[in-house]
């Protein structure tokens, strides 16, 4: 399975704590799978009390996570792998207290 880079929209009304939860969780997975520089969260743009940022996940990173979490990811909502992965990631973040909403960015859909 070859997966390209995931480009996600990260939207929240409380950027700093939500971003910290997301970065900490992804850093833990990155360490677990012995990878480096496998994700990025851009600085946010503020609008009407919301913060909007782009999150990038390297394809290899997504593949490693999927290999170890396939059962949970496959049980998530969605028809395509990308949708299931994002639904799983959203749930994992929520379980850790992150209130951000994530979704596949239009830039990823057009690739």
PLM region spans:
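Residue-level signal for secondary-structure boundary sites
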Residues: 16, 63-65, 110
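Short, extreme N-terminal segment that most often corresponds to the first beta-strand
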Residues: 1-26
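A structural detector for beta-sheet-dominated domains
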Residues: 9-11, 56-58, 103-105
